[in-house]
């Protein structure tokens, strides 16, 4: 039976309904500061916590609930005679429900505030109370999520109490929340690239129908702090996103964000199948489509500029899973919405520098994201690339970063005409890309050539310029072939493996 509740919330969503329900059940309500004022102004009978503790709020609100008269009432085990004897002797009344949500550190840490201002949003009293209540969940109901209010109200209406299983679940949510909350604070204070303990702070964004395959369950979690493209996008149309959709959308968006020029990326199974730049969105899309008109079917198309009606009409002619762009003209959106299953995604956040993580059995690999394109670029052949060839070489390196290794991209006039990836040796990747391209001007490789065979193959297809990291013990073989065939070659000094 709940006889006494303590309510202290930052987010006041639904709190009046809960408080008035408790009041109707003759539950005594204790509250603090702004919550006390809010409840009192709305006609709820409430006791100021100072009346309970006999001690005023102090240190600019840092100390309000940190008092034995509060925590003794929360932590006392009701069927422990010694506990009950002690609190009775000390004049402590049991507290049967704790309703608390925390200072919004997750949000405030990203605002334009000083370090000291952000520190003030690190909650101390709230976490202490809810941890205490969660530890003693058999005797105390703890609520930290506004979405749980209604369920608890209904359970009390039906059973006159909250059952042990619900209490346990609510207690588990406390420690789940505190893990994320403390992780965010830890990362804020440490500012270490690779701390001793890796603490991640993610919140469930949505349940997914299934994972990579229908027999795999799945959910999508997003970072509790920061602004990221795959956290802050807006779905304007279409079915719910799937596990594969989100993974593919991430790579497609990162690819187009590589370019200052108007760019389009068509992607399938986490691999670009067509990438192009143009003077207009329509031109970029047309060129990307022409890279591989077969593989684009059922894929994802991403743009780094607003989509216009003409482009939308062309997109609507084929089956696509997703179209993602920074924005859409109103008439373009109307066209795309005619395809009710097509997911139309507005994504304004640019791809960010950060960390990449990969799970292995029993561990997580963490690395800095691959954000450096070139380093110490130098021409290593007798012939140098033309200005246009150099533009295409840089374009090719931007694309090849997002192709599974071993990866080769063949480019002509800002268009990835052939993409070969996921091969266990480089010559196979080169043959795949060259064969798909049919014709091309330049070739980009994600890693060095171990032998001269890739340069030989490129020459057969009329390639005029090559860009690669260099660094092989047999670099001279490739340089010799290029000089003999009249091909220019550029070394970048930066490898772009993608596994």
UniProtKB/Swiss-Prot annotation:
Entry keyword set: Hydrolase, Multifunctional enzyme, Purine biosynthesis, Transferase
Record PROSITE patterns: MGS (PS51855)
Reactions that this protein is recorded to catalyse: (6R)-10-formyltetrahydrofolate + 5-amino-1-(5-phospho-beta-D-ribosyl)imidazole-4-carboxamide = 5-formamido-1-(5-phospho-D-ribosyl)imidazole-4-carboxamide + (6S)-5,6,7,8-tetrahydrofolate; IMP + H2O = 5-formamido-1-(5-phospho-D-ribosyl)imidazole-4-carboxamide
Keyword Thylakoid: no
Database matches in InterPro entries: AICAR_Tfase_dup_dom_sf, Cytidine_deaminase-like, MGS-like_dom, MGS-like_dom_sf, PurH-like
Family annotation (NCBIfam families): PRK00881.1 (NF002049), purH (TIGR00355)
HAMAP family: PurH
Swiss-Prot/TrEMBL domain comment: The IMP cyclohydrolase activity resides in the N-terminal region.
The protein's name in its UniProt record: Bifunctional purine biosynthesis protein PurH
Encoding gene (name): purH
């Amino acid at each position: 039976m709940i006889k006494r509740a303590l309510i202290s919330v930052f987010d006041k969503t639904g709190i009046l309904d809960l408080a008035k329900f408790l009041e109707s059940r003759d539950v005594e309500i204790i509250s603090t500061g702004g919550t006390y004022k809010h409840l009192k102004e709305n006609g709820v009978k409430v006791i100021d916590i100072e009346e309970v503790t006999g001690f005023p709020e102090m240190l600019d609100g840092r100390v309000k609930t940190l008092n034995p008269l509060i925590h003794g009432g929360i932590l006392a085990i009701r069927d422990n005679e010694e506990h009950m004897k002690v609190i009775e002797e000390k004049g402590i009344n049991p507290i049967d429900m704790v309703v608390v949500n925390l200072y919004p550190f997750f949000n405030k840490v990203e605002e334009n505030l000083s370090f000291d201002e952000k520190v003030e949003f690190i909650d101390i009293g709230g976490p202490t109370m809810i941890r205490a209540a969660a530890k003693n969940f058999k005797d105390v109901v703890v609520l930290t999520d506004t979405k749980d209010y209604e369920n608890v109200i209904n359970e009390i209406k039906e059973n006159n109490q909250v059952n042990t299983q619900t209490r346990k679940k609510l207690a588990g949510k406390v420690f789940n929340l505190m893990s994320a909350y403390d992780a965010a604070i830890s990362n804020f204070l440490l500012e270490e690239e690779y701390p001793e303990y890796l603490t991640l702070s993610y919140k469930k964004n949505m349940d997914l129908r299934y994972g990579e395959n229908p027999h795999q369950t799945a959910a999508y979690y997003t970072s509790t702090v920061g602004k990221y493209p795959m956290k802050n996008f807006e779905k304007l149309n279409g079915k719910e996103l799937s596990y594969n959709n989100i993974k593919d959308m991430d790579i497609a968006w990162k690819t187009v964000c590589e370019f200052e020029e108007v760019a389009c990326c068509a992607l399938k199974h986490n691999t670009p199948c067509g990438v192009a730049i143009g003077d207009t969105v329509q031109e970029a899309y047309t060129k990307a489509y022409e890279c591989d008109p077969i593989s684009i079917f059922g894929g994802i198309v991403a743009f780094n500029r607003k989509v216009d009606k003409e482009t939308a009409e062309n997109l609507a002619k084929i089956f696509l899973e997703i179209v993602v762009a920074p924005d859409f003209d109103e008439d373009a959106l109307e066209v795309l919405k005619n395809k009710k299953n097509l997911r139309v995604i507005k994504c304004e956040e640019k791809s960010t520098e950060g960390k990449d993580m990969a799970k292995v059995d029993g561990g997580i690999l963490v690395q800095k994201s691959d954000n450096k394109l070139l380093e110490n670029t130098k021409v290593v052949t007798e012939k140098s690339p033309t200005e246009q060839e150099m533009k295409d070489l840089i374009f090719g390196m931007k694309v090849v970063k997002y192709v599974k290794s071993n990866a080769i991209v063949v480019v002509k006039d800002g268009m990835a005409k052939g993409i070969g990836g996921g091969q266990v040796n480089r010559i196979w990747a080169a043959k795949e890309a060259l064969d798909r391209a049919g014709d091309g001007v330049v070739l980009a490789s994600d890693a060095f050539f171990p032998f001269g065979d890739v340069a030989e193959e490129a020459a057969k297809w009329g390639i005029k310029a090559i860009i690669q990291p260099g660094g092989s013990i047999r670099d001279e073989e490739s340089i010799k072939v290029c000089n003999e065939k009249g091909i220019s070659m550029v070394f970048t000094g930066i490898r772009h493996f993608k596994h």
